[in-house]
């Protein structure tokens, strides 16, 4: 029939076109094969990366650099992803310090125990920092470059004198293995956590307000008396003594506040630069290079308590297996 003849004719022409344009058909096949190869390669690479990061927990410099490019999570906290790179950054600094400064063999029994310790510390720290950043965004809390600069500037003062920024950067690289940009990132995250901890801790703020009222109603109450009065009202407060320390001592800003005082004088409340609470200091003694002081501390507790509550409510999910140790920040 005419239809059968037409079909045969089309088949013959199609075959002719294939012989007439062989390069076109070959090119299409090459493109198709190339796409298949690329997809398979990507899948294989993804499986290898997944295996190395999660089951194997590879902490090498290569995978640390890789996680800075690929934003893969190591955990989630209250719906926020904890970056694997932040965990590895903290862990690498601790490992570098143990190897270079403490000369610890990480393959020894003691070294393996230390690794478990700093792994938990690094993971809990990364989780806490991420949760702090989440709250900071909600409350509009920001940290400026100047605040980071001020922290670094205060660290340039040493017992033997003030060092240069270059010497400080070289020391950070040698001791912890961090570049200046990496260390600035760590400082920025710690400042965010501190700012959030102070912002949300209504208990500590109430204790501070109560202490200020007690101070105003009495003539120079001793720190011991003030601490007991706060404790009797149900507030958390503790006292302590520094002993003789150099005036360049890095202790959360307590020495620097004590330097402003006369003997036996008590400061007003201030926030420690380590973000662990509100302090009063009383100067005990001072020389040209050293001083000693007593202090009263009202600790911050609500941030860590919120993390504990999240853990209890299964709102913290960890994607790698890390043992619980005494270093844990999040008490479970």
Model-inferred region functions:
Residues 1-113, 253, 260-266, 275, ...:
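Short, low-structural-confidence N-terminal segments
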Residues 12-34, 213-239:
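N-terminal short leaders/motifs
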Residues 32-36, 116, 120, 185:
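Alpha-helical transmembrane segments of integral membrane proteins
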Residues 61-178, 182:
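N-terminal targeting/tethering segments
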Residues 69-97, 136, 192-196, 226-231, ...:
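FKBP-type peptidyl-prolyl cis-trans isomerase
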Residues 92-99, 123-142, 148, 153-164, ...:
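Sec-exported extracytoplasmic/periplasmic mature domains
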Residues 169-198, 252-297:
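Proteostasis/folding factors centered on peptidyl-prolyl cis-trans isomerases
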Residues 216-257, 285-292:
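Peptidyl-prolyl cis-trans isomerase
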């Amino acid at each position: 029939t005419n239809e059968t003849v037409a079909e045969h004719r089309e088949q013959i022409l199609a075959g002719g076109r294939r012989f007439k344009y062989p390069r076109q058909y070959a090119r299409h096949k090459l493109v198709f094969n190339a796409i298949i190869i690329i997809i398979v390669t990507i899948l294989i690479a993804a499986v290898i990366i997944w295996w190395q990061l999660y089951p194997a927990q590879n902490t090498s410099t290569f995978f640390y650099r890789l996680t800075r490019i690929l934003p893969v999570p190591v955990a989630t906290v209250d719906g926020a992803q904890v970056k694997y790179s932040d965990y590895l950054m903290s862990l690498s600094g601790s490992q570098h310090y143990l190897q270079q400064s403490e000369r610890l063999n990480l393959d020894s029994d003691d070294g393996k125990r230390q690794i478990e310790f700093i792994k938990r510390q690094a993971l809990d720290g990364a989780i806490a920092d991420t949760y702090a950043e989440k709250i900071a965004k909600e409350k509009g809390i920001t940290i400026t470059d100047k605040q980071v600069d001020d922290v670094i500037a205060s660290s340039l003062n040493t017992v033997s004198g003030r060092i240069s920024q270059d010497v400080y950067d070289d020391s950070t690289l040698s001791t912890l293995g961090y570049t200046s940009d990496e260390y600035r990132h760590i400082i920025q995250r710690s400042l965010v956590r501190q700012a959030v901890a102070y912002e949300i801790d209504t208990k500590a703020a109430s204790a501070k307000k109560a202490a200020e009222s007690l101070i105003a109603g009495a003539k120079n109450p001793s720190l011991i008396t003030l601490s007991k009065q706060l404790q009797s009202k149900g507030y958390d407060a503790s006292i302590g003594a520094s002993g003789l320390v150099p005036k360049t001592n890095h202790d959360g800003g307590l020495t620097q506040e004590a330097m402003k005082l006369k003997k036996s004088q008590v400061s007003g409340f201030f926030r420690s630069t380590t973000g662990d609470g509100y302090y009063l200091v009383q100067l005990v003694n001072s020389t040209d290079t050293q001083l000693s002081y007593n202090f009263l501390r009202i600790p911050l507790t609500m941030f860590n308590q919120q993390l504990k509550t999240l853990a209890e409510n299964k709102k913290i999910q960890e994607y790698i297996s890390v043992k619980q140790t005494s270093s844990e920040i999040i008490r479970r």
